[in-house]
Amino acid sequence: MSDLSSAAWEQRYQTGDSPWDLGFPTPPFVNLLSSSEAPKTGRIAVLGCGGGSDALLFAEAGFEVVGFDFAQTAIDRANARANDRGIDSIQFLQRDIFDLETEFANGFDYILEHTCFCAIDPELRSRYVQLVHTILKPQGQLIAIFYTHGRSGGPPFGAKPQEILDYFEPQFDRILFKPVTDSIDRRKGDEYLAIFQVRK
């Protein structure tokens, strides 16, 4: 898939060609929330939220959640799941994430990243980092799973662990950065869990 437009992502959701959307929360986030490293509750943005599985996990854990996705079908699916579960502490909005900076500047305690950084054109990664910095509150945190596979092409576009650090460490402090050991089978060895905090 070389077309990364909103229409292309929408078509993939409409045709069911969305293997990144597991239909259940990713195990590393489930286990993080039950660990001693679990973040305190707050307002969290989920970028590229897809069908909302990870967003709903955090809502059920007491977070106030706003999920954003390029594709309206993904947003409709996420809203339906929230309604089915009776969750009202969550909102899903169809947006281009790069349009969020003005409306949501300093708007979130946390940002949740799972399959967004790997889905955008790698040339936009510096802009993504600046977006995250802008919409987080002072000392806000990015909670992320990054794809570190070495395969060419994408999406998902991989990134070496040091590349990820090089993008974020000029503006963020590293709280946690480690290989994921509880990935689903097809992602084993290809993921890093990170928590980066906006530097004072």
Residues covered by each model-derived region:
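Class I (Rossmann-like) S-adenosyl-L-methionine-dependent methyltransferase catalytic domain
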Residues: S2-A45, G50-F104, I120-K200
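Conserved acidic residues
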Residues: D109
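A conserved beta-strand element that flanks and buttresses the S-adenosyl-L-methionine
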Residues: L112
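Short catalytic micro-motifs in class I SAM-dependent methyltransferases
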Residues: T115, A119
